[in-house]
Every structure is written in structure tokens, then in C-alpha cells.
């Protein structure tokens, strides 16, 4: 066999010899390997023919290393050992298809490119009902209030997703689309049609889903809430206090309930104010007149359920009055008593009551009113000795204009009005209803001798009714001179005092806003005195 091989090698061309060498080496390599031996360098002076194998030695495998750079250009081509390079079975001129193909992870997905695969499929698996029961801030709020809070600060929504749906929270940007037809239901304690927008962080695609938010405080309406309506009822017939003017009752109601709120309205001089009227005053009313305080007046106006009084309490918040039509309105706030746990969740209610049978100011017949004004003869005589009246009297006498009334329109008329106002006195005599009664003479201007009825700041009164009188209330001043039977000259003064009759809407009466449709009680005053 060895001799045949040598003979064949001497005949075949070099290219064939190379192929046979590969076969020969590969066969030997499979039987025995000696990686530790180094290849011997061939002698460059010998003919370039295959050397005879040394039968006394094992074949040297290192001769097959394709990386041996010391082999000459005429040396036979040595193929790599297939056992050392698994890819040597591939043809050298054909690329390795397995290596050049894109890996499965890098290859574009068919569903992504064709938009056939739903990237939001995981959103279909989450519950579309989100509970806020673990957040005490929201469990204490009704749905309407909670919705307003979430529109201002939706961070709690994101907190819920970060805890209950962490995978979704990490995968998507979540956005609350506020003011987008969401609907709050206080009775059920939920918010419906809440729209959340989910934007995929990788693909930058979005999807909007509707959710229901639950866990908010429910408005529970129980039958006991309606009992506030039954707690206070209007008396069918109000007695005793209806002979008084409604403005007086309204002011005393509010003042008696809270003195501090109305003390700044009172004048501190010698006047009639709240303190003179509260709890009755025999110098201003008849002895049988009712006490004027909040408890007594409420008892005259209302009927109270004593059992419900254990659960509720009331407070007067506003009053309205119309002294011309005899109308009194009272607005009450009814709330729960603090000490009763059974009613702590019940809402406060307001009730309005209107009473239309109170006393009216009669602007046509002053005899039916308790208020009258007068100027004493002595004061008028004193006024004629100086100022405008003295000048006018001299003019009338010198021109012999007797029994002819002259309207005073001099530029000094304001000073005369101030004199008249300061000297006017007040008489309270109630012939019609017999309830108002002043045991002493009163005045308009404040002084040490007489107590003024204008006991509220700004020239206002509350007794016998709420009105305002000042020097400008005095109008149409006439002066005339006559002679009596004894040929004594007399000066006669006539003037009118316009007293407004107020009506108001519901208010706390701390200001003097009126309806604007004012009526006037006009009092005509005449006085005569002899002159020199």
C-alpha cells in the first residue's frame, strides 16, 4: 500500500497531491493528535515535491494549521481541520447563511409592521372600576367634590395604578382627560365616564378608555332629615306683638340674639336704643306690653316640637320688614345639636317665614299713628328774636303784609332748619292700638333734658318704628303775621316733617339698605307766638 501511494504521488500533478494530502492528514488526525509538537520548517533547497512520510514517526498534525505563515507560496494548500472549525464543511466561496441571516430578535415582527397585533391587549384585562376606598381624603368627600379635587390634582389616580397595576404603570404614560363629560353621582358615591389616556412608552401609540371611580361618600337621605321641616312651624295666629311695628320686632330679634353684633349701631348718648327696648320698658310701653327678647318673640311667632328640639337648634340669620304694609319676614337656620351623634351627618337647612298681620304706618291719617311732633311756643318765641325769623318778621311788618303766608327760601334757611330740628319734641300717644306709651316727653335732637328717639347711628330710630329724621326732613317753612282782637301782632310758623316709612329685603339689618320704594309720613306742625 505504501509503495502504491508513493508511485501515485510521483505521477499526479501538484493540485491533486494537495487534495490527497488533505485526505491523508485528516485520516491520520482522527487517529492520533499531538498538539504539543511544533511543525518542522521545510528545507528550501530541496525539490518542492511531497516528502516521504517517515514510517518511524507518528504524523505531525500541526502541518494542517492554516495560520502557519512560514509555508512557502509553492507549498501545497492545507485545509483546516474540520474538528477544530465546524464551519469548514461550508464551501469557501459561499457565505455562511446561518451567520448572515438576521437573528429572530432583530427581525421586524410581522404584526408590528402590519399593525395587526393589538399592543394594548393588556389594557383589556384590567378592571375598569377604580376604587378610592383606601384614601380617607376622598372617602370623606362626595362625588361632586372629589371630581373637582381630581381635576385640580389627579396624582391619586397615578398612585393607584403604580400600586395595583404596576406593569401597566411602567409600560404606559397615563393621563387623566379632565372636563371630558365625566359625571359625578353623589347618591351612589361614584364618578362615571372618566377618560384615561394610555400612551405606550415604546411605540408612542395611545388609547383612551372609560373608567368608573368609586368609594366616595354617599349622600344618604333619611326620614329624620325631613324632621327639620317639622321642628318649627308658623303659628296660624300671632297675638300680642302684632300691635307693634314689624321693624321694631325685627331689630330686637337680631339684637337680643347677639348683642355684640349690633352694639356698634347704637348711639351712646341720652337716646332710646336696643338696651331701652329689650325685655320691656314701662316708660315706653303700657304695663301689659309683651317682653321684647328673642326667646319671647320666637315663642309668639312659632310653634316648636319639643322632642325634635332635643335634636335640633335654630338661629335667626336674617329679617325683612315692611312698615307700610305691616309685613315681617324671619329667616331661620336649623342645625343639629353638637352633642347628638344620631344627627351629625344631617345637613343644615334654612326656612323662611312671612307674617303679614303686623301694624302698619298710616300715612293718610296720623291720628292712627303713635308718633307726633311739636314745637313749643316758648322755643318759637325765642327763635323769633334772632336770625332769619327776626329779619323776616321785620320785613313783613314794615310792608304791612298781614295774614299772608310767605315761603322762606333764604340762603340762611339751613340754619333755621337746624334750629327747628333741635327744638322739636316728640310725643308718643297710642290712641289706636294702646300699646306704645311714653311717660315723658322725648325729642329728636339729643340733649340733657329730653331723651332722643334717634338712638341708632346716623340719625335713625327703632322706636316707635325704624326711620330717619334730620334737619333736611323739614320742608315747606311758611311764616305769616296776624293781629288778634286785642291788636296784638302774632307770628305764625308752619312747616312739614317728612318721615320715611321703610321696607327691606332679607338682611342682617346691619346696614340701612331699603327697597327704594319709600313712602312718607308727613307731619304738619303749626305754632304761634306774640311779637313786639
Swiss-Prot record:
Compositional bias of kind Low complexity: 59-75
Subcellular location: Cell membrane
Biased composition (Basic and acidic residues): 34-43, 91-110
InterPro entries assigned to the protein according to its UniProt record, in alphabetical order: Mycoides_lipoprot_LppA/p72
Family: Belongs to the mycoplasma p72 lipoprotein family.
The keyword Lipoprotein is annotated on this UniProt entry: yes
Protein name: Immunodominant protein p72
Stretches the record annotates as Disordered: 26-119
Assigned keywords, A-Z: Cell membrane, Lipoprotein, Membrane, Palmitate, Signal, Virulence
Source superkingdom: Bacteria
Topology of the protein relative to the lipid bilayer: Lipid-anchor
UniProt signal peptide: 1-24
Transmembrane segments: none
GO cellular component: plasma membrane
Lipid tethering residues (N-palmitoyl cysteine): 25
Lipid-substituted positions (S-diacylglycerol cysteine): 25
Purpose: May play a role in virulence.
Amino acid at each position: 500500500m505504501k509503495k502504491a501511494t508513493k508511485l501515485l504521488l510521483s505521477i499526479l500533478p501538484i493540485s491533486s497531491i494537495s487534495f490527497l494530502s488533505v485526505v491523508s492528514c485528516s485520516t491520520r488526525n482522527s487517529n492520533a493528535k499531538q498538539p504539543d509538537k511544533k511543525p518542522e520548517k521545510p528545507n528550501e533547497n530541496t525539490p518542492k515535491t511531497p516528502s516521504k512520510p517517515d514510517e518511524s514517526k507518528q504524523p505531525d498534525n500541526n502541518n494542517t494549521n492554516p495560520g502557519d505563515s512560514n509555508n512557502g507560496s509553492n507549498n501545497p494548500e492545507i485545509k483546516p481541520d474540520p474538528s477544530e472549525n465546524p464551519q469548514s464543511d461550508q464551501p469557501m466561496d459561499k457565505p455562511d447563511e446561518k451567520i448572515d441571516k438576521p437573528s429572530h430578535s432583530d427581525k421586524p415582527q410581522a404584526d408590528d409592521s402590519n399593525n395587526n397585533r393589538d399592543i394594548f391587549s393588556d389594557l383589556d384585562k384590567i378592571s375598569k372600576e377604580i376604587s378610592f376606598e383606601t384614601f380617607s381624603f376622598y372617602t370623606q368627600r362626595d362625588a361632586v367634590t372629589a371630581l373637582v379635587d381630581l381635576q385640580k390634582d389627579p396624582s391619586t389616580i397615578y398612585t393607584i395604578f403604580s400600586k395595583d397595576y404596576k406593569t401597566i404603570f411602567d409600560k404606559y404614560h397615563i393621563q387623566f382627560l379632565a372636563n371630558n363629560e365625566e359625571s359625578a353621582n353623589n347618591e351612589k358615591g361614584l364618578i362615571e365616564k372618566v377618560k384615561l389616556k394610555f400612551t405606550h412608552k415604546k411605540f408612542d401609540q395611545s388609547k383612551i378608555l372609560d373608567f368608573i371611580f368609586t368609594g366616595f361618600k354617599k349622600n344618604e337621605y333619611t326620614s329624620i332629615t325631613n324632621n327639620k321641616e317639622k321642628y318649627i312651624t308658623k303659628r296660624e295666629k300671632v297675638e300680642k306683638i302684632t300691635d307693634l311695628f314689624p321693624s321694631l320686632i325685627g331689630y330686637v330679634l337680631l339684637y337680643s340674639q347677639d348683642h355684640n353684633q349690633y352694639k356698634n349701631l347704637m348711639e351712646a348718648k341720652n337716646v332710646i336704643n336696643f338696651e331701652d327696648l329689650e325685655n320691656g320698658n314701662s316708660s315706653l310701653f303700657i304695663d301689659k306690653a309683651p317682653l321684647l327678647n328673642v326667646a319671647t318673640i320666637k315663642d309668639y311667632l312659632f310653634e316648636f316640637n319639643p322632642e325634635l328640639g332635643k335634636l335640633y337648634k335654630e338661629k335667626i340669620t336674617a329679617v325683612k320688614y315692611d312698615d307700610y304694609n305691616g309685613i315681617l319676614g324671619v329667616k331661620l337656620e336649623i342645625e343639629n345639636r353638637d352633642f347628638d351623634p344620631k344627627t351629625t351627618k344631617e345637613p343644615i337647612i334654612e326656612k323662611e317665614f312671612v307674617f303679614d298681620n303686623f301694624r302698619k304706618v298710616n300715612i293718610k291719617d296720623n291720628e292712627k299713628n303713635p308718633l307726633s311732633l311739636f314745637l313749643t311756643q316758648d322755643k318759637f318765641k325765642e327763635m323769633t328774636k334772632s336770625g332769619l325769623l327776626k329779619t323776616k318778621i321785620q320785613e313783613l311788618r314794615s310792608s304791612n303784609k298781614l295774614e299772608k303766608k310767605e315761603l322762606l327760601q333764604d340762603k340762611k334757611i339751613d340754619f333755621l332748619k337746624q334750629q327747628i330740628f333741635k327744638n322739636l319734641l316728640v310725643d308718643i300717644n297710642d290712641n289706636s292700638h294702646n300699646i306704645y306709651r311714653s311717660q315723658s316727653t322725648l325729642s329728636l335732637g339729643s340733649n340733657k333734658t329730653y331723651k332722643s328717639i334717634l338712638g341708632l347711628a346716623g340719625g335713625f330710630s327703632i322706636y316707635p318704628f325704624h326711620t330717619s329724621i334730620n334737619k333736611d326732613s323739614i320742608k315747606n317753612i311758611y311764616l305769616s303775621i296776624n293781629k288778634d282782637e286785642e291788636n296784638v301782632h302774632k307770628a305764625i310758623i308752619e312747616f312739614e316733617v317728612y318721615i320715611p316709612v321703610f321696607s327691606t329685603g332679607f338682611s342682617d339689618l346691619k346696614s340701612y339698605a331699603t327697597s327704594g320704594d319709600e313712602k312718607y309720613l308727613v307731619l304738619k306742625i303749626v305754632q304761634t307766638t306774640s311779637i313786639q
